[in-house]
Amino acid sequence: MIPDIRIEDYNYPLPDERIAKYPLAERDSSKLLRYIDGKIDEFVFRQIPELLPSDAVMVFNDTKVVPARLHFVRPTGARIEIFCLQPVKPEEYNISFAATSSCSWKCVIGNAKKWKGDILDLYNPENAPEIAEMAMKARLVSREGETGIVEFSWSGGYPFSRVLEICGTIPIPPYLNRESEAIDSERYQTLYAKFRGSVAAPTAGLHFTQAVLDAIRSKGLDIETVCLHVGAGTFLPVKNSEVAKHPMHREPFVVTLDFLKDLRSSGKSVIAVGTTSVRTLESLYYIGVSCIETGAPADVDQWAPYTREYKWSTEESLDAIIAYMEKNSLDKISAGTRIIIVPGFRFRIVDMLVTNFHQPESTLILLVSAFVGGDWKTIYDYALSHDFRFLSYGDSSLLYRRK
């Protein structure tokens, strides 16, 4: 049964001055709130290796934020902002980023009403030679509301990934209320980001430095990675009072066969770094169920965890994915998830969570509440009254799941 949840029950007062507009000078100097068995204490983030159990697996999302925000201009002079969401033609991220003359993407189009279908030129007010040489253009293929399919074309033989690096800007969250700056290219990106595709950072990972990662390894924890490309839906508030009416956007993810085998055999506690890692890990169970019941993986529906009973164990589910991959000689598996994690969700894989402090009335607050129960209010009250910084560039928390 889909839970009857009112989003107003997950509100809290967040003054604008508590939203971190910029990162601290050092990634690991942020504050860290630890919640375990109803108790709260605080540390500096660089102390996190001391707080973690050594017999655990720590899972990071190694997606990379792309400079997905582009500005074009009509012949009339009107500016049109185009925000790339996901590739359409070619559909695979790596192939689209490797394209050297054209590709099409699903995009959010700012000032959309002013784009009448004419071909746009990239906005280049300073006449930068490298940008001028590309002669980048945008053509509207189709439109649906504020989104549309846009075909980009350019000269010079550059791969599209390089085109974005030269012409685009990092799409920082709207609640920062500022334009993207040079510092964001470095700091709105995790140190271990590897695979391009996200339009928002998995911000729990922004605090990790090489020294912190080395200390975690030295303590004996297993470090693993998954890759979920974070979509623009991560910025969307829950607009309907009834959470059941909130649509989740599909986000693609990839996990490797080696990772699944390690996860299946370790028997250790699992620490997820960020809500995107949680959503990937918890989606795996339903991917495995699909392999058992239909013989193949399928995308995870938003309400799949709540609308039926599941008789399969987590071990059986993971075994089914592994068997499917081995049978088809796959070293990695790609799927999509719309999973929403709300109070009442049964966690099957994740035991601990590293995460920032999230917006009121957001799906991320619902996930935290599902993880720690009603104590989410106590945690957030503590953070507000103890000078913690909030949202993407804010401070961090280490949460133990309420058993």
Where are these regions (language model features)?
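Surface-exposed, charge/polar-rich loops and edge strands
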Residues: 1-403
